[in-house]
Swiss-Prot record:
Record's protein name: Nicotinate dehydrogenase large molybdopterin subunit
Family: Belongs to the xanthine dehydrogenase family.
Cofactor: record remark: Binds 1 Se-Mo-molybdopterin cytosine dinucleotide (Se-Mo-MCD) cofactor per heterotetramer. The cofactor is bound between the NdhL and NdhM subunits.
This protein's pathway: Cofactor degradation; nicotinate degradation; 6-hydroxynicotinate from nicotinate: step 1/1
Coiled-coil segments on the chain, per record: none
Catalytic reactions of this protein: nicotinate + NADP(+) + H2O = 6-hydroxynicotinate + NADPH + H(+)
Organism, scientific name: Eubacterium barkeri (Clostridium barkeri)
SUPFAM superfamilies: CO dehydrogenase molybdoprotein N-domain-like (SSF54665), Molybdenum cofactor-binding domain (SSF56003)
Function: Catalyzes the hydroxylation of nicotinate to 6-hydroxynicotinate. Also active against 2-pyrazinecarboxylic acid, but inactive against other nicotinate analogs.
């Protein structure tokens, strides 16, 4: 392979670096238009409940409030989702998490928006909240969607796992748990919607997914995609957290009814509450090896909390399942993964899509094996590392190297040099 790279080793200037340094980059909240309205969302204050009554009349009567809308105002589809359409734009039957959107308000000033939100009254029939994966899986657990809380199931098997464990010289077994994480992007969710000079409903928004956004906004408003335009503003961080919808549909719905530009900027608290999170997972892993440290079998039982809505759950469970073995040759593999709905915050896309959680599991097991066998943790990794030509449990044959062995060896050399690795391990 030649060394005349176009990117590696070259200084590449980001296209928006100058604007950010000069302070001229326009983020979504920086956009304003004449006669623009401000918007806010009335959200659920309970995690699981049926709506008995919703009174918007007092909010609508406030002078300067131009729209107070619930799901009845949606002309098209009231369900969205990148893979499974299970999240309402505005709740129509029951709330499934704290912070579900129930109504939207547009008014002439931000203070009037808050006054209108405070004037809305609601009565709930509260339901049992499901906050653990264990409770979600119990037979008498109330279903959050449909008739079951099981969201996704994946199974991966390769070789003869049971027979392989019987031949192992050593077996280590443990349970690993990872917690829910929020992206904490610097810029909270924000957007502005308006009709352009040609009658195109346009949304300028902080997003990572403009083409998906357009389809969802168009579907909600029963418009063809050609009548909706999404403009991705300079985006102040996302890390996967802005792949889901945020303000797009709410702004667009208010502009659709008022025919005026509408701006919505979430507070830090609101953005953190309702944006997606990294999936919490629990993984029970059993790993077998020969006395010289060569892996023979891996068995994993994995559970994940996808929260109230699917978001990217189907993609996350798939990637977590196929990465349970890590970058190691394992001739016998069995993985059973199950993701469940709960009334917790929605889990979605977060850098790594389930692979970081799986890494906690397989790297913990490699450390446990090394300790039990009295081996150097780096040696056992090098011994089992994938090389070109290796066949994975998924059937994939590796045609190229990512330099794992070389990287481990270089890392150890540096560790010996700067911290006396041989003395501290």
């Amino acid at each position: 392979m030649g060394k005349d790279y176009q990117v590696l080793g070259k200084n590449k200037v980001k296209v928006d670096s100058l604007e950010k340094v000069m302070g001229t980059a326009k983020f979504a909240a920086d956009y304003s238009f004449p006669d623009m309205l401000y918007a806010g969302v009335f959200r659920s204050t309970v995690p699981h409940a049926r709506i008995v009554s919703l009174d918007l009349s007092k909010a609508r009567a406030i002078d300067g409030v131009e729209a107070v809308l619930d799901y009845h105002a949606i002309p098209g589809k009231n369900r969205f989702g990148i893979i499974i359409k299970d999240e309402p734009c505005l709740v129509d039957d029951k709330v499934r998490r704290y912070g579900d959107a129930i109504a939207v308000v547009a008014a002439q000033t931000p203070d009037l928006v808050q006054e209108a939100l405070d004037a809305i009254t609601i009565e709930y029939e509260e339901l049992e909240g499901i906050f653990t994966m264990e409770r979600a899986l119990e037979e008498d657990s109330p279903a959050i969607h449909g008739d079951t809380n099981i969201h996704q199931v994946k199974h991966l098997e390769y070789g003869d796992v049971d027979a392989a464990f019987k031949q192992c010289d050593i077996v280590v077994e443990d349970t690993y748990s990872t917690h829910r994480l929020t992206h904490m992007f610097i810029e909270p969710d924000a957007g502005v919607s308006y009709y352009d000079n040609e009658g195109m409903l346009t949304v300028v928004v902080s997003t990572q997914n403009p083409h998906y956004d357009r389809g969802e906004v168009a579907g909600m408003l029963a418009l063809p995609n050609s009548k909706v335009r999404i403009i991705q503003a300079t985006t102040g961080g996302g890390f996967g957290g802005k792949l889901d919808l945020s303000v797009q549909c709410h702004c667009a719905l208010l502009t659709y009814h008022t025919k005026k530009p509408v701006k919505m900027v979430r507070s830090r608290e609101e953005s953190t509450t309702v944006s997606s999170k990294r999936h919490p997972m629990t993984m029970h892993c059993k790993t077998g090896a020969t006395k010289d440290g060569r892996l023979q079998a891996v068995q994993v039982e994995m559970f994940g909390d996808t929260g109230a809505y699917a978001s990217y759950g189907p993609a996350v469970i798939t990637r977590a399942t196929v990465h349970c073995m890590g970058p190691y040759v394992v001739p016998n593999v069995r993985v059973d993964a199950k993701f469940v709905y709960t009334n917790n915050p929605m889990s979605g896309a977060f850098r790594g899509f389930g692979v970081p959680q799986a890494s906690v599991c397989h790297e913990g097991q490699m450390n446990a094996l090394a300790k039990a066998l009295g081996m150097d943790p780096i040696d056992i990794r090098i011994l089992n590392a994938h090389q070109v030509g290796a066949k994975l449990a998924t059937g994939q044959v590796l045609e190229n190297s990512v330099g794992l062995i070389e990287t481990l060896e270089k890392a150890r050399e540096k560790a010996v040099e700067v911290m006396g690795y041989e003395k501290t391990r």
